[in-house]
């Protein structure tokens, strides 16, 4: 890595807690959402949120914080941010940041507003993927990417392995792998992305989360549910 290189890192709550010890936070911090996770280790949601706030705790006025305006908890973070706050939303315009307008993504930063058309051509299903695109676009712009290049990459991106990854189609049935959805909330986002009822295979280890909302989403979006793993009976 060169001294002027840009490194993109996904940090867990455990790693963010360690940032507090060395009194460091990223120059550009991105928060996509907040929902219960790793409560088997953190004990409660307050401790989990405190760990997550390590990503902004040691920022300065020269740094940036990119927050999801569609997440009520993250909207409350603004008053604690020391860096410049930019927002993104898949549901409404924001005063500065990235948002949706018709079939376009709007990048509105530093008094300049640019429409990036073609959202209908995005290859990833679900509102949560639009939110991820907006977050990444905002961070890329702040890191020096040009707006036309951002739009080109959005249209070309087909997703990552294990994240609503299209596997294959057999006899008219499409198979998707979303095994990276390790919380009820991420699984809800995935099954909500499909227009037709799904046959869902789900299960795994217990991290202390409630499955009530997940069960409600299954009733709404799944035709059949096959449960496996340690949480199958829960």
Outline where the language-model segments fall.
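Short, intrinsically disordered, charge-balanced linker/junction segments flanking boundaries
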Residues: 1, 5, 231-234
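Secondary-structure transition/turn motif
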Residues: 106-113, 179
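Short coil/turn connectors at secondary-structure junctions
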Residues: 2-6, 24-27, 61-62, 81-83, ...
């Amino acid at each position: 890595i060169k001294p002027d290189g840009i490194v993109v890192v996904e940090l867990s709550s455990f790693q963010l807690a360690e940032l507090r010890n060395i009194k460091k936070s990223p120059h550009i911090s991105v928060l996509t959402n907040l929902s219960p996770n790793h409560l088997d280790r953190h004990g409660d949601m307050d401790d989990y949120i405190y760990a997550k706030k390590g990503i902004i705790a040691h920022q300065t006025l020269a740094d940036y914080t990119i927050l999801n305006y569609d997440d009520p908890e993250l909207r409350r973070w603004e008053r604690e941010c020391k860096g410049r706050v930019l927002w993104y939303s898949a549901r409404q315009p924001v005063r500065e940041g990235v948002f949706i307008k018709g079939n376009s993504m709007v990048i509105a930063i530093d008094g300049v507003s640019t429409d990036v058309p073609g959202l209908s051509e995005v290859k990833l299903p679900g509102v949560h993927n639009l939110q991820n695109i907006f977050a990444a676009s905002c961070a890329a712009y702040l890191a020096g990417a040009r707006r036309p290049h951002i739009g080109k990459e959005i249209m070309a991106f087909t997703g990552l392995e294990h994240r609503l990854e299209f596997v294959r189609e057999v006899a008219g049935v499409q198979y998707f792998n979303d095994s990276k959805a390790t919380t009820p909330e991420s699984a809800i986002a995935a099954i909500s992305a499909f227009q037709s009822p799904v046959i869902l295979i789900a299960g795994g280890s217990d991290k202390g989360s409630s499955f009530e909302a997940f069960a409600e989403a299954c009733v709404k979006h799944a035709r059949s549910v096959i449960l496996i793993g340690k949480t199958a009976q829960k």
